[in-house]
Amino acid sequence: MIINNNISALNANRQLNLTGNSMTK
């Protein structure tokens, strides 16, 4: 369960990074 939660958090962070990068461009 802990591993799945970490993966979900990583995916959420990556999604935020992608949206942030697209906004700065």
UniProtKB/Swiss-Prot annotation:
Coiled coil: none annotated. The keyword Cell inner membrane does not apply. One of its GO terms (cellular component) is periplasmic flagellum. The keyword Protein transport does not apply. Keywords: Bacterial flagellum, Periplasm. It is found in: Periplasmic flagellum; Periplasm. It comes from the Bacteria. Component of the core of the flagella. The flagellum consists of an outer layer composed of two sheath proteins, flaA1 (44 kDa) and flaA2 (35 kDa) around a core that contains three proteins flaB1 (37 kDa), flaB2 (34 kDa) and flaB3 (32 kDa). Belongs to the bacterial flagellin family. This is Flagellar filament core protein flaB3. It comes from Brachyspira hyodysenteriae.
